[in-house]
């Protein structure tokens, strides 16, 4: 007889679905086999925060993949709001002001901040169009160095 094996809580299942009912159905189907879930922008406006709270009440880990990118004061306050939800992970864009503000906003909570270095959809040509004179690889490496200096917990780099 096979023993029930719990998943590695460091692995997050992306709930990139169009509505919370579909996400709830998937969570129910997976039961205790998955301990950690990512909720992104697609679900944000249709109940993603509330879904995250339901999952936390079930003992699950929550990763809000919201990629904050705003002025420092706004990112700091928004990060503080995410902390009040007892989230485990949050993404922000890897601009120094954004990263520093998110680190400041988390205060003494256990929230881990991940910095998104460069969106995967940006190639050399699209980066040039928005004013960057580096290719994606160079920009990723530069932003990783900045992320380390700013005190975030990890990076999302591809």
PLM segments and residue spans:
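N-terminal amphipathic alpha-helix/helix-capping segment at the start of soluble metabolic enzymes
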Residues: 1-26
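Conserved anion-binding
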Residues: 7-8, 70-158
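Short beta-strand/loop segments at the ligand-binding rim of alpha/beta enzyme cores
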Residues: 8-10, 55-66, 109-114
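Conserved, mostly hydrophobic/aromatic
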Residues: 13, 37, 67, 90, ...
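Short, well-ordered alpha-helical microsegments
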Residues: 23, 47-48, 98-100
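Glycine-rich, proline-tolerant flexible connector loops at the mouths of alpha/beta enzymes
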Residues: 38-47
């Amino acid at each position: 007889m096979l023993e029930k094996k719990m998943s590695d809580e460091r692995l997050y299942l992306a709930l990139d679905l169009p509505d919370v009912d579909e996400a709830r159905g998937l969570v129910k189907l997976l039961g205790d086999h998955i301990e950690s879930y990512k909720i992104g922008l697609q679900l944000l406006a249709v109940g993603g925060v509330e879904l995250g709270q339901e999952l936390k009440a079930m003992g699950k880990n929550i990763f809000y993949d919201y990629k904050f990118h705003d002025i420092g004061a706004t990112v700091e306050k928004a990060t503080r709001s995410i902390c009040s939800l007892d989230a485990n992970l949050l993404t922000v864009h890897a601009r120094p002001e954004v990263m520093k503000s998110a680190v400041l906003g988390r205060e003494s909570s256990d929230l881990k901040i991940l910095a998104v270095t460069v969106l995967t959809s940006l190639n050399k040509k699209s980066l040039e169009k928005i004013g960057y004179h580096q290719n994606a690889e160079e920009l990723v490496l530069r932003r990783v160095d900045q992320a380390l200096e700013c005190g975030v917990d990890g990076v999302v780099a591809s």
